[in-house]
Amino acid sequence: MARAFLFVLDSFGVGGSPDATSYGDEGADTLGHIAEFCAAGAADREGLRSGPLSLPIMSGLGLLEIAKAATGRYPLGMPLPQKLYGLYGCANEISRGKDTPSGHWEIAGTPVTFDWGYFPTEGDAFPPELVEAICKAADLPGILGNCHASGTDIIARYGEEHIRSGKPICYTSSDSVFQIAAHEQHFGLERLISLCQIVRTLLDPYNIGRVIARPFIGETPANFERTGNRRDFSVLPPEPTLLDRLVAAERKVHAVGKIGDIFAHQGISRIIKANGNMKLMDATLKTMDEAADGDLVFTNFVDFDMVYGHRRDVAGYAAALEAFDARLPEVHRKLKPGDLLILTADHGCDPTWRGTDHTRERVPIIAYELGIRSRPIGIRQTYADIGETVAHHLGIAAGPHGRSFL
């Protein structure tokens, strides 16, 4: 049994989704396009990185074979390893959305088979009666934005007016989400969190997946900067997840990063917060020391998506992958006999793609135990196979979706 460690590299898709055309994402390939840009020198940035994409640890764990299975081709410029370690494959998503809750819940054995509510792309994003209810319930003079937007762009556009007027900046995206940006000092972080809780309640009839608090600091567009105090307010998963089943079996679920928020704090034994991939890795390594037999440590590495994918920053995404890969030997040193490590993703966010939204892609599955014989696990038909593999490994009853690949 030992322990399980589930790491989600947020948005690290590997292309090839059979239903990508339905989402306008045919050809999207986060890994493949990053590698292509790196190989061409288009992801060189002075003081950050240069040259072909270099991920020797994940390549040795089967990442390049995963890419080949997903898309039919190896990533450009990345040398094939002489030997492979662990299990490797990829998975299709059966949830209808390409958003964070859908991906994570499906990973945890609970696909989202219903349709989320979404806001219109033309005209005002939010209905007048909703805006009126929010302003009345939260005692606001009004809102700014009321549109589809990139988070950094809309703060630059409305940040100064927000500071002058006290009106929060409200916006959405192609995901089922209501995002609220507000200044940590001028508006107040606690007030922003309280506002998000009010909006979460008002949005339930609209079937919106998440309300996200996006605090920022600075005084002008030149120095506005989002802080690490983001909070996600999600609806509850539609049925018990792997996390609920583990807690019911008296195991501990250690949620690192935004995992607690994604699951609406249900099925969580302990929450460990950290900001930035490297600090998230530090927190994860510490939690690995503290986890007991039968426990799950579940970490979301959000920067790949939030800082690089949505901002279409290819060089930044490549450098973040290389920095993550370089720390995997530290993870390996923490593993005990019988421990299971799984690396995966929740969706794609191809930084070379049009727009700023997520992309529908297959996700990688890398699974490793000390001494395990390397083999491919093929293309899995649902992310839920990941959760069922963890359930099997930790010795709890199987759930209704997915099947273990162990």
UniProtKB/Swiss-Prot annotation:
GO MF term list: magnesium ion binding; manganese ion binding; phosphopentomutase activity
Sites where the protein binds Mn(2+) 1: 10, 346-347
Main location, first listed in the record: cytoplasm
Reactions it catalyzes: 2-deoxy-alpha-D-ribose 1-phosphate = 2-deoxy-D-ribose 5-phosphate; alpha-D-ribose 1-phosphate = D-ribose 5-phosphate
Example of a GO biological process term: metabolic compound salvage
Pathway stated in the Swiss-Prot or TrEMBL entry: Carbohydrate degradation; 2-deoxy-D-ribose 1-phosphate degradation; D-glyceraldehyde 3-phosphate and acetaldehyde from 2-deoxy-alpha-D-ribose 1-phosphate: step 1/2
Keywords on record: Cytoplasm, Isomerase, Manganese, Metal-binding
Superkingdom of origin: Bacteria
Location relative to the cell: Cytoplasm
Names of required cofactors: Mn(2+)
GO terms under cellular component: cytosol
InterPro entries per record: Alkaline_phosphatase_core_sf, DeoB, Metalloenzyme, Phosphopentomutase_DeoB_cap_sf
Disulfide bond entries: none
EC number, as in UniProt: 5.4.2.7
Residues binding Mn(2+) 2: 305, 310, 358
Details of cofactor binding: Binds 2 manganese ions.
Function: Isomerase that catalyzes the conversion of deoxy-ribose 1-phosphate (dRib-1-P) and ribose 1-phosphate (Rib-1-P) to deoxy-ribose 5-phosphate (dRib-5-P) and ribose 5-phosphate (Rib-5-P), respectively.
Entry's family note: Belongs to the phosphopentomutase family.
Protein name per Swiss-Prot or TrEMBL: Phosphopentomutase
Species the sequence originates in: Rhizobium rhizogenes (strain K84 / ATCC BAA-868) (Agrobacterium radiobacter)
